[in-house]
Amino acid sequence: MEEPGATPQPYLGLVLEELRRVVAALPESMRPDENPYGFPSELVVCAAVIGFFVVLLFLWRSFRSVRSRLYVGREQKLGATLSGLIEEKCKLLEKFSLIQKEYEGYEVESSLEDASFEKAAAEEARSLEATCEKLNRSNSELEDEILCLEKDLKEEKSKHSQQDELMADISKSIQSLEDESKSLKSQIAEAKIICKTFKMSEERRAIAIKDALNENSQLQTSHKQLFQQEAEVWKGQVSELNKQKITFEDSKVHAEQVLNDKENHIKTLTGHLPMMKDQAAVLEEDTTDDDNLELEVNSQWENGANLDDPLKGALKKLIHAAKLNVSLKSLEGERNHIIIQLSEVDKTKEELTEHIKNLQTQQASLQSENIYFESENQKLQQKLKIMTEFYQENEMKLYRKLTVEENYRIEEEEKLSRVEEKISRATEGLETYRKLAKDLEEELERTVHFYQKQVISYEKRGHDNWLAARTAERNLSDLRKENAHNKQKLTETELKFELLEKDPNALDVSNTAFGREHSPCSPSPLGRPSSETRAFPSPQTLLEDPLRLSPVLPGGGGRGPSSPGNPLDHQITNERGEPSYDRLIDPHRAPSDTGSLSSPVEQDRRMMFPPPGQSYPDSTLPPQREDRFYSNSERLSGPAEPRSFKMTSLDKMDRSMPSEMESSRNDAKDDLGNLNVPDSSLPAENEATGPGFIPPPLAPVRGPLFPVDTRGPFMRRGPPFPPPPPGTMFGASRGYFPPRDFPGPPHAPFAMRNIYPPRGLPPYLHPRPGFYPNPTF
C-alpha cells in the first residue's frame, strides 16, 4: 500500500541536482531573480517540486483508500452470500442423514428377525459342549493334586531330619553378623574423627587464604597510589619542560627579529660608505689646485669648521659598523647556543616520552598480572566452596546412613525373634524360614562385599583429598611468594621515586646498579636484610611456626649444600655471574627454582613412605618442592624473606613429625646427623609398591593423636592436615597400632550387626580417612 509513496523519495536528490544544473546553464537574462519576494530562487524551486510530489502522493493515497473501501463492501456482500449457501448445504445434509438412518434401521430390523432363531439353537449346543470339557479338566486336575500331595508328604518327612542342622547354621550366622556390626561401628567412629580433622584443616586453610587476599588487596592499593604519584610528578615535569620550551621559542623569535634589524642597518651603512669615499676624493682635488701653502693652510683653518663635521660623522659611522659586526658575531654565537639548548631540550623530551611509554607498558603488564592473580584467587575460593559443600554432604549422608542402619538392625532383630518363635511353635513353616535365611545370607554377603568395596574407595578418596590439601597449601605458599615479589617491586619503585625527587636528571643509572646499591633488599653482610630497612614487613600468618633446627644441617635450614641428591646446585650461577654456593650456605635465604629438573609428579612419588611393616630407610629426607620465583638470583626476596625464614611448609612438617615422634618413643635415636644419604632407594620402593600404593601412617604415639605445639603464636594440634591413611584395608599391621592398654580379647577384623547393646570403644582409634559407607537395601 505504501510503495508508490516510497518510490519518489530516493529520486528527489537527483531531481534537485538536475534542476540546479538547468538553472545554472540558463543565461543571466533567462534566470529568475535571486530573491523573489525575499526568498532565494533555489528554495522556491525546491518547494515547488516538493509540493508537486506531495500532491501526487496525496492523490495516490486517496485513490488507494477509496479502492480499499470498495473492496471491503464487495467482500461483505460475498461473505453474506457464502454464509447463506453454507446454511442451505447444512440443511440438505441433515435431511440426507435422517433419511439414511431410517433406511438402515429398517434393514437391521428385518435381518434380526431372520437370524434370532438360528442363534438360539447354536448357543444351546455350545453351552453343552463347554460343560463337558470343564468336567474332564476338573477330573485331571484332581488327579494331579493327589500326586503332588503324596510327594509333599515324602519331602516333609525328609526335612524333619534337617531341621536341627539348619538351626545350628542360623545361630552361627547370627554370631558372625554381630561381629560384623561391631566392626562397622568402630569404623563409623573413626570416620567421624577423620571428618572433624578435615574440618579443622579447612578452617585453617580458609584463614590463610583470607590473609593472602588481604595482602593482595593492600599491595594493589599501594601499587595504584605509587603509580598515581609517579604519573603526577611526570606530568608536572612535562608541563615545566613545555613552559621552558615556549620561553626558548619566544627568545629565539626575539633574537631573530634583532638580527634582521641589525642586518638591515648594516646594509644601509654599506650603502653610505661609497658616498663618503667620493666626498673625500673631491676634497683632496681641491687642496692640490692651490699654489700657496699659506693660503692652503688658511683655507684649511677657515674651512676646517665646515669640513670636520662630515669626516667625524663618517668615522663615527665606521666605528658603529665595526661595533655592529662584533655584536652580530656575538648574537650569532648566542643563537647557536640557543639552538643547541633547544636540541638538548628536544632530546630530553623524547627521552621522557620514551620513559613514559615504558612506564605505561609496565603498568599494563602489572594490570594483566593483577587480573591473573584475581582469577586464581576466585578459582581457589570456588574450590574451597566445593570442598566444604562436599564435606557437608558426606556428613549428612553419614548421619542418614547411621539412622538407616540402626533401624535396619532393629528390624532384623525383630525378624529373628519372630523366626525363633515360629520355629518353636510350628514345624511346618521350616521350609519358608530356610528360604528366608538363605535370602538373608545372600543379602549379607552382598552387603559385606559392598562395604568392603566402599571402604577401599573411600580410603582412596581420603588419600586423594590429602594430596589435594597438600597441593592447596603449596599453592598458598606460591601466592605468598608472589606477594613478596610484588612487595620487592614496590620497594624498588619507591626508591626510584625518591631518587627522581632528589635528582630528576639521574635517569641514566642502570637498573642493576640501582637495585644492588640502593635497594633495602640487597644482600647484607649477614645474608638477609634487617627488619627496620624494609618498607613492607610481612605479617605473621597462622601457618608460621617457630624456628626448628633441621637434622640435616647444624645451623638450620632444610637444604644443605652437601646433599648428594641435588648435584646441580653447586654449578648454578646467579644474575651477577657468581656461583650459587653462597645462596646455599645462607640458611635464611629463599630457595630458588633452578635446583630441580624433575616434574611435580616425580617429586610426589619421592614423598612416598615405606609400607607399615617396614622401617624408614636411612636415606635423605624426601626432597622439598622447590620455589617458583627468584630463579638464578642472589638477591634476597625482600619483604618475603622473613616468611621463608619463619614458616615451615607442609613438606617440612611431614618430614619433621616422624623424626620427632620416633625420638619421643626411643631415646637411643637422638643422633640424626647421618641422614644425608642419596634417595636412590625411594624410586625402587615406589615401583615395587605399584600404582595403587597408599602412604602409611605416622609412627605410633601414646596419648593424644596429635601433639600440642605450644611454641607457636597459636595453640593448635599437630600439623594443619591429618596424616595419610593406613596402607591396609580391614585391619592394619601390628607395627601401626599402639600397645593395648585395656584387657579383653582382640576385636574381630570385620564385624557386622549385633542384637546385643553396643560396647565401649577403645581409647585409641587408628585414623581411616575417607570412610563413608553407603548401604543399599
UniProtKB/Swiss-Prot annotation:
InterPro entries: cTAGE_MIA/OTOR (IPR051500). Residues 510-673, 721-742 are annotated as: Disordered. Its main location: membrane. GO terms for biological process: endoplasmic reticulum to Golgi vesicle-mediated transport; protein secretion; vesicle cargo loading. The keyword Transmembrane helix applies. Keywords: Coiled coil, Membrane, Transmembrane, Transmembrane helix. GO terms for cellular component: endoplasmic reticulum exit site; endoplasmic reticulum membrane. The chain crosses the membrane at residues 39-59. Residues 118-269, 339-498 form a coiled coil. Residues 572-591, 649-672 have a biased composition (Basic and acidic residues). It comes from the Eukaryota. The keyword rRNA-binding does not apply. It is found in: Membrane. It is a single-pass membrane protein. Residues 530-541 have a biased composition (Polar residues). Belongs to the cTAGE family. PANTHER family: CTAGE FAMILY MEMBER 15-RELATED (PTHR23158:SF57), MELANOMA INHIBITORY ACTIVITY-RELATED (PTHR23158). This is cTAGE family member 8. It comes from Homo sapiens (Human).
